[in-house]
């Protein structure tokens, strides 16, 4: 990790922490309707928290999960590269990804040739969505 990357990561963490303190879990839950076409939230016991599509991976327990690791899902090269680095989803990473998946993959990986398969961008409310997904356990 370069010195610049390390400084940028600390700066992002310092800026992101106050934003997540104001995140609205209920709004994130309500906004999940925008995600249901592609994603579901299904607990390990099979109970449905949010029924939805299968185009994207199940988002139950996504916070703390290694990036690009949900079983039997065909991830793109961007998330697979981050998985190979050992990256793990946290609220800040997930919110940044939700806001602009391809831009985040390029920045997080340091490889401008990589992209994300997810094309949807949540231009507002990404922090709320990440907080909601973190609350689902």
Question: PLM ranges: what are they?
Answer:
Residues 1-8:
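Bacterial N-terminal signal peptides that target proteins for export
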Residues 11, 16-18, 23:
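N-terminal signal peptide c-region/cleavage motif recognized by signal peptidases
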Residues 16, 26, 126-129:
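Generic low-polarity alpha-helical segments
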Residues 23-25, 29-87, 101-112, 136-137:
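Periplasmic/extracellular electron-transfer cofactor-ligation site
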Residues 87-137:
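C-terminal capping alpha-helices of c-type cytochrome domains
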């Amino acid at each position: 990790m370069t010195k610049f990357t390390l400084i940028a990561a600390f700066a992002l963490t310092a800026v992101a922490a106050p934003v997540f303190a104001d995140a609205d879990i209920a709004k994130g839950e309500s906004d999940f309707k925008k995600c249901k076409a592609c994603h579901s939230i299904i607990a390990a016991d099979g109970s449905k928290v949010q029924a939805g599509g299968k185009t994207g991976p199940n988002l139950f327990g996504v916070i703390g999960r290694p990036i690009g690791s949900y079983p039997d899902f065909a991830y793109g090269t961007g998330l697979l590269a981050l998985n190979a680095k050992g990256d793990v989803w946290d609220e800040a990473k997930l919110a940044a990804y939700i806001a602009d998946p391809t831009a985040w993959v390029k920045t997080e990986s340091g490889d401008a040739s990589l992209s994300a398969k997810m094309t949807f961008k949540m231009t507002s409310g990404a922090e709320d969505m990440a907080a909601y997904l973190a609350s689902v356990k």
